[in-house]
Amino acid sequence: MDSLDQCIVNACKNSWDKSYLAGTPNKDNCSGFVQSVAAELGVPMPRGNANAMVDGLEQSWTKLASGAEAAQKAAQGFLVIAGLKGRTYGHVAVVISGPLYRQKYPMCWCGSIAGAVGQSQGLKSVGQVWNRTDRDRLNYYVYSLASCSLPRAS
């Protein structure tokens, strides 16, 4: 049986090669990628660059205590965003279910202006996308309503 977050993974796959901002592929734009995934799922998302998005998530979404809790919520079908503000540009990613890297970092999907080193198509954890200093400062936010659910029996 698929994990309940399969619809989120599918939205990530569908958003990867699209452009949220004209001319900028989502795989090269973390905030555009997250915006596209949220739009596909019908989830309201704060607008702007990653720093602005983290500010908005802090105000309107529920903050989670750990990467393990973030992975658990993702496995339950909730859209979970990992984010960290930066001096100029921060970074945001979509958390998905799966094994925790080093027992605390959840798997993720994210675009990045840094190219392959900062990108993940669900095969890297936030602990591999962010550097060793920043990965322990990440915040995790969950949307209040589940984005995925089990199919109804016919």
UniProtKB/Swiss-Prot annotation:
Reactions the enzyme catalyzes: Hydrolysis of gamma-D-glutamyl bonds to the L-terminus (position 7) of meso-diaminopimelic acid (meso-A2pm) in 7-(L-Ala-gamma-D-Glu)-meso-A2pm and 7-(L-Ala-gamma-D-Glu)-7-(D-Ala)-meso-A2pm. It is required that the D-terminal amino and carboxy groups of meso-A2pm are unsubstituted
Top-level EC class as recorded in UniProt: hydrolase
Keyword Phosphoprotein part of the UniProt annotation: no
Outcome of substituting H91A: Complete loss of peptidoglycan degradation
EC number: 3.4.19.11
Catalytic residues, chain numbering: C30, H91
Keyword Signal belongs to the record: no
GO cellular component, one term: host cell membrane
Annotated keywords: Disulfide bond, Host membrane, Hydrolase, Membrane, Secreted
UniProt subcellular location: Host membrane; Secreted
Primary site of residence: host cell
SUPFAM superfamilies: Cysteine proteinases (SSF54001)
Disulfide partners: C7-C148
InterPro entries xrefs: Papain-like_cys_pep_sf (IPR038765)
Purpose: Toxin secreted by the H1 type VI (H1-T6SS) secretion system into the periplasm of recipient cells. Degrades peptidoglycan via amidase activity thereby helping itself to compete with other bacteria. To protect itself, the bacterium synthesizes immunity protein Tsi1 that specifically interacts with and inactivates cognate toxin.
Subunit (UniProt): Forms a heterotetramer with Tsi1 consisting of two Tse1 dimers and two Tsi1 dimers. Formation of the complex inactivates Tse1 enzymatic activity.
The protein's name: Peptidoglycan amidase Tse1
Organism of provenance: Pseudomonas aeruginosa (strain ATCC 15692 / DSM 22644 / CIP 104116 / JCM 14847 / LMG 12228 / 1C / PRS 101 / PAO1)
